[in-house]
């Protein structure tokens, strides 16, 4: 979220950043809203100040036995009192209009983010690992899972509809093993603190990380019982990512600089409506309403944020290296960035069944964009004035897509799947998954 004072002082820079995102200029409209807000506040305050002054003048007039003056002032007071509610309402509406407009503005890209329109313009940063070579035509993950009798989309559809899956037996264990492996790696070697957070969150938490108000249509809401729509105060949201709850751990707090960086990780179910994905990845586990993801969140200072971004990317990459999966890293162009991001790296894992790379992790630096919405600050060492923290988030990595990658990269001609060496300690002696 941007400070209107910063926009007023840097209107050309603000508009240039929007244009790089492919968005129209907006500073003039925002400054007009701010002018209206200032005028409404000034008018309301002037009326209140006049009421206060008139009250004192009435006392002085009565003390001087100037009844005519006192009565005139009382009449003026009555008029001011009568218009006061309208002035206060105008002030409230003017403030709300500006706040609403500011809340819907995406973050601006850093200068080194490549310009582009969509994912086709994302430059490749590096390619890592060797793609497996098969003596047979590799299958896609859903054919492998269904062939094993362990991946059941029909049963899931009976329970919940489209874009759900039921994994069973050793395949379910393999998925659980992936999440455990990721948490152990990030907590044991990468310095993250494991968190087991709620997966239901309130409006203010999702506003803080900027899923609300812009991304509401892509989320699932939950009520206690069949609550009527007007009972919005009891509304919860199923988290689309544990970034929401991990980042909000510092909402409305003032940290000491020596506490930073804070690094959190969690492996949770996530829920997305996939509102804009009609017709895409309709079969399989690539794009589901419910999926498991291991999340990485860092809270740090402005000076260390970019270094922390590179570190987070390295931590996410290490998951794929340990699993022996080939991947590439791309930098998202200005037209493909997320709403809250200043800069994003995507890691795309190689899927031989599909014959292409698919996203398995996004690592983003957000600057103070989320911190301003959350009012999350820190006090520099030896300083009196507080500053906004900088926040980062990344997938470390998507567990469901990691399962897809393992199935496709470790498949065998007989339909079985070898378990990656890194996961063997979690599999209870299972080294190969075959049809039972």
Swiss-Prot record:
Catalysed reactions, semicolon-separated: tRNA(Ser) + L-serine + ATP = L-seryl-tRNA(Ser) + AMP + diphosphate + H(+); tRNA(Sec) + L-serine + ATP = L-seryl-tRNA(Sec) + AMP + diphosphate + H(+)
Cysteines joined through disulfide linkages: none
Positions of transmembrane segments: none
Pathway the protein acts in: Aminoacyl-tRNA biosynthesis; selenocysteinyl-tRNA(Sec) biosynthesis; L-seryl-tRNA(Sec) from L-serine and tRNA(Sec): step 1/1
Residues annotated to bind ATP: 272-274, 359-362
Positions contributing to L-serine binding: 241-243, 295, 395
Subunit comment: Homodimer. The tRNA molecule binds across the dimer.
Family statement: Belongs to the class-II aminoacyl-tRNA synthetase family. Type-1 seryl-tRNA synthetase subfamily.
UniProt name for this protein: Serine--tRNA ligase
Organism field: Beijerinckia indica subsp. indica (strain ATCC 9039 / DSM 1715 / NCIMB 8712)
Lineage, broadest ranks: Bacteria, Pseudomonadati, Pseudomonadota, Alphaproteobacteria, Hyphomicrobiales
């Amino acid at each position: 979220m941007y400070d209107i004072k910063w926009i007023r002082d840097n209107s050309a820079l603000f508009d240039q950043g929007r244009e790089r995102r492919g968005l129209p200029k907006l500073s003039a409209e925002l400054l007009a809203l701010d002018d209206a807000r200032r005028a409404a506040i000034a008018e309301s305050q002037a009326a209140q100040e006049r009421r206060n002054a008139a009250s004192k003048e009435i006392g002085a007039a009565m003390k001087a036995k100037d009844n005519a003056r006192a009565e005139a002032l009382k009449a003026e007071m009555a008029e001011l009192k009568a218009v006061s509610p309208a002035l206060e309402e105008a002030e409230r509406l003017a403030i709300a209009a500006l706040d609403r407009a500011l809340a819907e503005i995406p973050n601006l890209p850093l200068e080194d983010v490549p310009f582009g329109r969509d994912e086709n313009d994302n430059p490749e940063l590096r390619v890592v690992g060797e793609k497996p070579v098969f003596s047979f035509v590799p299958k896609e993950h859903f054919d492998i899972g269904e062939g094993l009798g362990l991946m059941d989309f029909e049963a899931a559809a009976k329970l919940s509809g489209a874009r759900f899956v039921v994994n069973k037996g050793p395949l379910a264990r393999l998925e659980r093993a992936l999440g455990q492996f990721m948490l152990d790696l990030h907590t044991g070697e990468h310095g993250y603190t494991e968190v087991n957070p709620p997966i239901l969150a309130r409006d203010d938490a999702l506003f803080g990380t900027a899923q609300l108000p812009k991304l509401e249509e892509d989320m699932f809401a939950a009520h206690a019982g069949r609550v009527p729509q007007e009972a919005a105060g009891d509304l919860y949201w199923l988290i689309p990512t544990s970034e929401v709850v991990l980042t909000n751990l510092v909402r409305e707090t003032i940290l000491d600089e020596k506490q930073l960086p804070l690094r959190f990780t969690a492996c949770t179910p996530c829920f997305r409506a996939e509102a804009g994905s009609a017709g895409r990845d309709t079969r399989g586990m690539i794009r589901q309403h419910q999926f498991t993801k291991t999340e990485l969140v860092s809270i740090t200072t402005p000076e260390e944020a970019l270094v922390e971004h590179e570190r987070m990317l390295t931590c996410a990459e290490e998951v794929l290296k340990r699993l022996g999966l080939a991947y590439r890293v791309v930098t998202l162009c200005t037209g493909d960035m997320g709403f809250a991001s200043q800069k994003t790296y995507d890691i795309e894992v190689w899927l031989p069944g599909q014959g292409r790379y698919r996203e398995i992790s996004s690592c983003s630096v957000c600057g103070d964009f989320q911190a301003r919405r959350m009012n999350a600050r820190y006090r520099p060492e030896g300083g009196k004035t507080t500053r906004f923290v900088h926040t980062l988030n990344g997938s470390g990595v998507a567990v469901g897509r990691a399962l897809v990658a393992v199935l496709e990269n470790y498949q065998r001609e007989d339909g079985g799947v070898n378990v990656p060496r890194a996961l063997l300690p979690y599999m209870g002696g299972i080294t190969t998954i075959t049809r039972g």
